[in-house]
A protein has these predicted regions:
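Transmembrane helical elements of multi-pass membrane transporters/channels
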Residues: 16-32, 137, 171, 200-204, ...
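Helix-terminus/linker motif at the lipid-water interface of multi-pass membrane proteins
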Residues: 30-49, 118-125, 181-188, 247-280, ...
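Short alpha-helical transmembrane segments in multi-pass integral membrane proteins
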Residues: 1-18, 76-141, 185-240, 296-365, ...
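Small-residue hotspots at the loop-to-helix junctions and early N-terminal turns
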Residues: 43-56, 131, 135, 194, ...
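Small-residue-rich hydrophobic transmembrane alpha-helices
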Residues: 48-108, 145-164, 271-334, 370-389
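Signature of the first transmembrane helix
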Residues: 12-73, 77, 240-260
Length: 452
């Protein structure tokens, strides 16, 4: 389970570590897209909109949990890189206690806020009932979502990106089968989509716990579960800025969804579908962020900052290169991709395809810029300077992404293309800020050398 990533070819380590990560993200996105694809075949636009809006809320919650767990990945990775196995075990034990409390609190709070949340995001009237049902069931499953993500973060901190891939593969297969059962056979609509998602996560957690019991690379003692202020400080010091950053990014996209919702049901469905497609295309940037965090943390822990910088360079090259290719391809295939998620033979479906194609053609350029600033964010996390990642994203959201989308929505009511371009412009601003921050860090020679 544990793997040393501080020796050998940096490029090879990046590729070999990121591929399972990439496949994990692919599978996770696939089962999220499966909900929309399957419900689009068996239900109408209202149900599709309910699932797309509800899944955006759940995606926001999930990425915040993943962001918080980044503190575990980096803390465990630095301990492993430094050869401190006892410290790694202590970090893991404190993580378990922390996220146990977080999952219970989130479940209780969000279940009491289902209706206010649905109202706050301006859900179209026809989709309100389905969205409430979807979110209620998914909120009940928060402990499973939390458990899966902290287990995966621990494995990745230990240098193992393959096991989490197997866990999510199990969840993906279960979700697709359950979706067809609940929506195709039993016709449960949004409730069926939520049940499939929740139960598949539970199955994945059972599988991951079974693997942990069989492997004993890191042995946990009772004392490891005793809360330690220093350990919690490290985990939360890295995780909280990333969690808030990811949460605010999702808030920005929910605001964009609200803006789209106010334009009508077809625009709302189009934006919801494109968000799912973009989440699929963002697999490479996302995997590079996590790869740079994990590899960078181990190398910084081992006192090899130059290898962390090399990791960043290769990640930027791979992610930005992918973004360029994806941007070119989407210009020729946008409507065809959107049509997979709705019935273009109906009047509403044809409108969704048209609007979705417009939005996707503009939005896709975000793949290039996100590939760059995601990689830098991973590097900043590895250096335990996750506050920089938080700041560049906040500036991009407040100064460019949300204002840009709002203005273009008002100026161009007949098309979604300018809204897509405005979203990409936010990431371009992030890239500029990241380059400036990285230059300052290099000049001041403060890379790494994080306090013990």
């Amino acid at each position: 389970m544990e793997k040393n990533l501080t020796t050998g070819s940096v490029f090879k380590n990046v590729v070999l570590f990121s591929l399972p990560y990439l496949l994990s993200y692919f599978l996770q996105t696939l089962y999220g897209m499966a909900d929309l694809f399957i419900i689009g075949r068996f239900e109408g636009v209202a149900s599709t909109t309910a699932v797309s809006i509800g899944s955006q809320v759940m995606h926001m919650l999930t990425v915040m949990i993943v962001g918080l767990s980044m503190g575990t990945t980096v803390s465990v990775g630095q301990a492993v890189g430094a050869g401190e196995r006892k410290q790694a075990a202590h970090n893991i034990g404190n993580t378990v206690i922390l996220f146990l409390v977080v999952s219970i609190a989130l479940t209780a709070i969000l279940l009491s806020l289902v209706h206010p949340i649905v109202v706050a995001i301006s859900t179209p009237a026809d989709a309100v009932s389905g969205t409430v049902t979807y979110l209620t069931i998914c909120f009940i499953g928060i402990p499973f979502i939390t458990s899966y993500n902290i287990i995966s973060s621990i494995f990745r901190g230990l240098g193992d990106s393959k096991s989490p891939m197997c866990f999510i593969a199990t969840a993906c297969a279960a979700n697709i089968a359950l979706d067809y059962l609940f929506m195709g056979v039993l016709h449960l609509g949004p409730a069926g989509a939520a049940l499939g998602t929740t139960l598949s996560q539970a199955i994945s957690v059972v599988v991951s716990l079974t693997v942990i019991l069989k492997r004993r690379s890191i042995v946990l003692k009772k004392s490891d579960f005793k809360l330690c202020r220093a350990v919690m400080g490290k985990i939360l010091g890295i995780g909280i800025p990333i969690a808030f950053q990811d949460g605010l990014i999702q808030v920005a996209f929910i605001i964009i969804t609200i803006i789209a919702n106010q334009r009508g049901l077809n625009d709302a469905a189009a934006v919801g579908i494109v968000e799912k497609v973009i989440s699929f295309l963002f697999l490479v940037p996302s995997s590079m962020l996590s790869t740079v965090s994990a590899l960078g943390a181990q190398n910084i822990g081992a006192g090899k900052p130059e290898r962390a910088i090399q990791t960043l360079r290769y990640a930027v090259m791979l992610a930005a290169g992918f973004g360029v290719l994806a941007s070119i391809a989407i210009q020729f295939t946008a409507e065809g991709i959107v049509s997979l998620f709705t019935d273009p033979s109906t009047a509403d479906g044809a409108a969704v395809v048209r609007f979705g194609g417009q939005y996707l053609r503009g939005y896709i350029f975000d793949c290039i810029f996100a590939g760059i600033h995601f990689s830098f964010s991973g590097f900043f996390c590895a250096c335990r300077k996750s506050g920089l990642s938080f700041l560049h994203n906040i500036f991009a959201i407040v100064l460019m992404r949300v204002p840009g989308v709002y203005v273009t929505s008002k100026l161009f009511p007949a098309t979604l293309l300018p809204m897509g371009l405005a979203t990409a412009a936010g990431s371009l601003l992030s890239v500029v800020i990241c380059l400036i921050a990285f230059g300052v860090i290099r000049r001041k020679s403060t890379l790494v050398l994080v306090e013990e």
